[in-house]
Each structure stands twice: as C-alpha cells, then as structure tokens.
Amino acid sequence: MNGLQLIATGGALPGRTITNDALSRMVDTSDAWITSRTGIRTRHWCTEDESAATLAIAAARQALDRSGLAPADIACCVCATLSAPDATPSVACQVQAALGLPENRPALDINAACSGFLYGMAVARGMLTTLGGQYALVIGCEALSRLMDPTDRSTCVLFGDGAGAAIFRLADTPFALTLGARGSDVLHAGGPSREGSAPITMDGKAVFRFAVDALPKCLHTVLDETRLTLEDLSWVVCHQANSRIIDHCIKALQADPAKFYKNMDRHGNTSAASIPVALNELAESGQLTPGKPLACIGFGGGLTWGGAIFQYKE
C-alpha cells in the first residue's frame, strides 16, 4: 500500500473576525482595493488566549473524533506551521499530549510555508511506510497575525489565522505527490523566539509570477502520474492566497471554475492551514465524494511548491 487516503478532517478558526472595513481604519486601504486585488473580504485573527497550538489541538481533536479511531491508532503526528508560539516544544508534541496520542510515536513540526501541508503529507507517508502503522495525523496551523506589521498594508490585509487537520491512512487507491523548492528571498518571517520582532514581508509581484506558473505544472504532474484527467477529479483545492492566482490557473488549464474551491474571501491567506481548512469545509458540507479522487496544489515562501492527488474515504 503506497498511497494515502483521506478519512477524516477537522478545523478551527479564531474568534476574532477582521473585515476589510476594519483594516481601512488601521491602514490606508479600502474594502474595494483589497477585494479587487485579492478576493479577500474577511479574515480571522487570534485573540489573546489563542495561538497556532490551541487551534491545532482543536482541529486535531475534531478530526480524531470524526474518524472513529482511538488515539492509539495514530502512528505519527506532523504539523506544518511557520508561526509556532514556542521554539520548543513543537506544536505537534503539544497536540500529542492534548489528545493522548501514544508516547512511542513520532511527532514533529515542519516549515515549508504555504506548501507545508503537502510537505507534511509526504513526511507522514514516509513515516508510515518506514516505521509502520496505518494512520497519520497531518495538521496545518498558523497564527500569522502575530508575525505581521499591522501598519504594512501589503501584508496585513492578506493573512489570517486558523488550523486544519486531516487523518490519512495507507491505501491502494489513486495517489500521487510532487514537491519542489527553489531558494529565493521572497518571504521572510521572524523566528518564533522573536515573535513580532521581524514581521512578514513579501514581494507580491514575484510570488504572483511564480504561482501562476507553478500551480498548473504541479497539477499536470500529479494527473500524469495517476493517469487521471481534470474531469476525473471531484475538486481541485489550491492554496488560498489570492483569487486572481487561482483564476489564472483555471484559465491556463482551460478548466471548469466550479471544480476549484475558494474560501479566501472569508479566511484570507492562512498559509499552511489553507488547504486543510478548505478540505474540512468541503467535508463538513458534504461536498467530498466518497471514493472519488481530488487534487490539492500549493506554493509558498522558500520558494516551495507541491501537488497531491488522493482519494476521499469510500
């Protein structure tokens, strides 16, 4: 069994909702300016007692409850984040403790920026095949509001906080995964021990050019590997960075826009959390078709990128 099959999801969003109008009172911007350039209307920011770790724990607990599995069934926990509240312990170890996962199983954080969830899938799959076990918990969580300069309109309008979790199992079902990285000075964020002292900065134009090239290529790669077509997929879930990026991808692929899920209008760019948050929304609303494959494609700082095709549980 070489593939991963999605069996359960969970999600968590902070209690504080920030509208474009609220941001227009903080920086020189407007709802029309933000919406026309990004497609974002609202985003969620952590309250004082929330963090990437608390959100991850809530999302993971929901996924575990929905899976019908016991904590002892989880063979590994991988958490993708660039905004962990502590240098150590990792968010994954905090999740392990909170959910009562076995102590003799690996738990670790990784940072591949907005591609992190896809990288996390690869790490989890490798652990299952190398160390044994059937089920993996993969989380993407962020508290990017803690890493932003609230006076920088080029970033504060984009980013939101949130967490998504997914439980995968090894399965002989359609599966493909591709990852890549290209060293580049596109996104910088201060380390967790210096939270807030080195805020996120981004070369938006460079990221846009990179993304509209990388996303279609990633999707073609995993489609070719599985010998599937776009028509075979139930959904294509892109990293939710910017509506215009996804629209360019749709045009390049000559694809049906209805097949591409979007939620950045409500959540903004939640980096590593964006893909699993979207998966959870699709699962909660009954829009994931059991037994049918779907694709996830993402890109992020580094530069990094990735794509995956996998099946939702039968």
Segments and roles (model prediction):
Residues 27-36, 86-100, 137-144, 189-194, ...:
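Acidic-glycine-rich active-site phosphate/pyrophosphate-binding loop
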Residues 80, 111, 136-142, 168, ...:
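Short beta-strand segments
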Residues 6-8, 34, 63, 77, ...:
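Buried hydrophobic positions in well-ordered alpha/beta secondary-structure cores of metabolic enzymes
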Residues 1-48, 150-209, 213, 217-220, ...:
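Condensing-enzyme catalytic core mediating Claisen C-C bond formation in acyl metabolism
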Residues 127-160:
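Flexible, glycine-rich active-site loops centered on histidine and acidic residues
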Residues 59-75, 217-234, 282-287:
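Phosphate/pyrophosphate-binding loops at sites that engage ATP/ADP/AMP, CoA/4′-phosphopantetheine
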Residues 53, 57-60, 64, 83-84, ...:
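Claisen-condensing/thiolase-fold acyl-transfer catalytic domains that form or cleave C-C bonds
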Residues 40-42, 73-78, 97-111, 145-151, ...:
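Glycine/charged-rich beta-loop-alpha catalytic/anionic-binding loops adjacent to active sites
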